């Protein structure tokens, strides 16, 4: 596979942006131009390069609006939104739980630009709020199929959730970009620790995502009752997610109202993920009490000073966990696990995938452990999708292979929701 950068981190994140081109989130030459302006491992040049492309895309969007070119305007707004997201992606602030104040401004700008694009979509889109604990309201977007793409009967629903760092607007390039044309309603949302909920409301991430998912499903059921003209089928609700979002999807799938689950390249345990980046001897000494938290913090901060990727990872994790100490961040990670029989609670059909070239997760540990612990399933009710090359989906979260991920996802849902399509 060709690489844009020698460093895996910037290379993967570039593939992540370029991969959205199939659904309008990028243009190849714009990406190549940005790459040429970025120094590997330098977050400042990264942010500047994508900000330039964002502004250029927005100029094109306004020109297209003035000339009445709906498609060009929509696509340019999509690119402007996605490049704006990318421009703020590498911001680390002053360290864990000390975010850059620009992060909130960028997230809100991404949202505003994306809504301009959504107003030009060929299918209905609703921007809604989900009531949640403590008076919070989770932002969500409901993408509905156009009338000519409706399936017989009521509309099946896919809830597509984010993970550690994706914004709701980026989630569009996964399932919402394909689902409505296949007759599905797709709902995306941001929960505690994600997107605007983190940057604007300082709502921290929580491991018991079934509580979050339950509120989302409650909202959908009430929406279906109060707006029967939407024709939503709450007896056919699926839940999906990628990476940490795949973990969240499996937690959500314990709710009996979830009738199918798609977990793409999930993690089994956040702690296990972290331990792949740290010496086992060092961690064992800490857990045995031979090293204090302060010593761990000092060593990890030295590592952060030498590696931008580690600095970014711990800064992001510390912010969504609400912790400044590396030792406390790692302790928080222990709470995010599917161990202890969690997967025994899942009764619905599950599609779970792995990524052999993952930047973060070792598939044989995470994916296969999840698959093997889905003990309440017959072979037909749990499907395993392992990939060998990037074109087949071997990059984490199926980056660069979004069309393939959608094809696999909706084929699986069709099978378990009783949807039959005529051969072409």
Curated annotation (Swiss-Prot):
Q: Name one GO molecular function term.
A: hydrolase activity
UniProt-listed InterPro entries: AB_hydrolase_1 (IPR000073), AB_hydrolase_fold (IPR029058), FrsA_esterase (IPR050261)
Q: Which residues form the active site?
A: 243
Q: Which Pfam families is this protein grouped with? A: Abhydrolase_6
Under the heading SUPFAM superfamilies, the entry gives: alpha/beta-Hydrolases
User: What induces it, per record?
Assistant: Expressed exclusively during fungal penetration of host leaves, the time point at which plant defense reactions are triggered.
Cite the entry's keywords alphabetically. Hydrolase
Q: What is its EC number?
A: 3.7.1.-
Biochemical pathway:
Secondary metabolite biosynthesis
Q: What class of enzyme is it?
A: hydrolase
Briefly, what is this protein's role? Hydrolyase; part of the gene cluster that mediates the biosynthesis of a tyrosine-derived cytochalasan acting as a fungal signal recognized by resistant rice plants and leads to avirulence in Pi33 resistant rice cultivars. The first step in the pathway is catalyzed by the hybrid PKS-NRPS ACE1, assisted by the enoyl reductase RAP1, that are responsible for fusion of the tyrosine precursor and the polyketide backbone.
Q: What PANTHER family has UniProt attached to this entry?
A: ALPHA_BETA HYDROLASE PSOB (PTHR22946:SF13), DIENELACTONE HYDROLASE DOMAIN-CONTAINING PROTEIN-RELATED (PTHR22946)
Record-stated family: Belongs to the AB hydrolase superfamily. FUS2 hydrolase family.
According to the record's subunit comment, the protein's assembly and interactions are: Homodimer.
The protein here is known as: Hydrolase ORFZ
Name the encoding gene, please.
Answer: ORFZ
């Amino acid at each position: 596979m060709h690489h844009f950068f020698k460093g895996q981190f910037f290379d993967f994140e570039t593939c992540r942006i370029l991969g959205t081109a199939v659904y309008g989130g990028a243009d190849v030459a714009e990406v190549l131009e940005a790459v040429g302006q970025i120094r590997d491992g330098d977050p400042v040049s990264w942010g500047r390069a994508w900000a330039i492309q964002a502004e250029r895309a927005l100029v094109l969007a306004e020109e297209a609006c003035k000339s009445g070119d709906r498609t060009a305007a929509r696509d340019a707004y999509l690119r402007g939104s996605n490049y704006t997201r990318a421009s703020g992606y590498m911001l680390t602030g002053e360290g864990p739980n000390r975010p850059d104040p620009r992060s909130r401004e960028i997230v809100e700008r991404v949202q505003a630009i994306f809504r301009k694009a959504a107003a030009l979509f060929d299918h209905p889109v609703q921007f809604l709020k989900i009531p949640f604990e403590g008076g919070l309201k989770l932002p969500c977007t409901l993408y509905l199929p156009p009338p000519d793409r409706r399936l017989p009967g009521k509309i099946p629903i896919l809830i597509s959730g984010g993970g550690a760092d994706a914004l709701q607007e980026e989630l569009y390039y996964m399932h919402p970009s394909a689902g409505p044309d296949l007759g599905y309603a797709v709902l995306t949302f941001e929960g505690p620790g994600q997107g605007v909920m983190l940057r604007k409301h300082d709502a921290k991430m929580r491991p018991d995502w079934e509580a979050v998912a339950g509120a989302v499903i409650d909202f959908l059921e009430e929406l279906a009752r109060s707006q029967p003209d939407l024709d939503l089928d709450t007896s056919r609700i699926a839940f999906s997610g990628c990476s940490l979002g795949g973990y969240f999807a499996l937690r959500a799938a314990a709710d009996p109202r979830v009738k199918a689950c798609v977990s793409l390249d999930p993690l089994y345990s956040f702690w296990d993920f972290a331990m792949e980046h740290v010496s086992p001897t060092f961690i064992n000494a800490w857990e045995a009490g031979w090293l204090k938290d302060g010593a761990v913090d000092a060593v990890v901060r030295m590592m952060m000073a030498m590696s931008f990727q580690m600095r970014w990872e711990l800064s992001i994790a510390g912010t969504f966990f609400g912790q400044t100490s590396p030792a406390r961040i790692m302790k928080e990670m222990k709470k995010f696990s599917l161990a202890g029989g969690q997967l025994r609670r899942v009764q619905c059909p599950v599609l779970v995938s792995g990524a052999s070239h993952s930047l973060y997760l070792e598939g044989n540990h995470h994916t296969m452990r999840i698959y093997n612990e889905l003990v309440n399933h017959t072979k037909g009710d749990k499907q395993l999708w392992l990939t060998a090359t990037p074109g087949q989906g071997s990059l984490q979260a199926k980056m660069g292979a979004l069309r393939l991920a959608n094809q696999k996802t909706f084929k699986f849902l069709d099978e378990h929701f009783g949807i039959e399509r005529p051969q072409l």
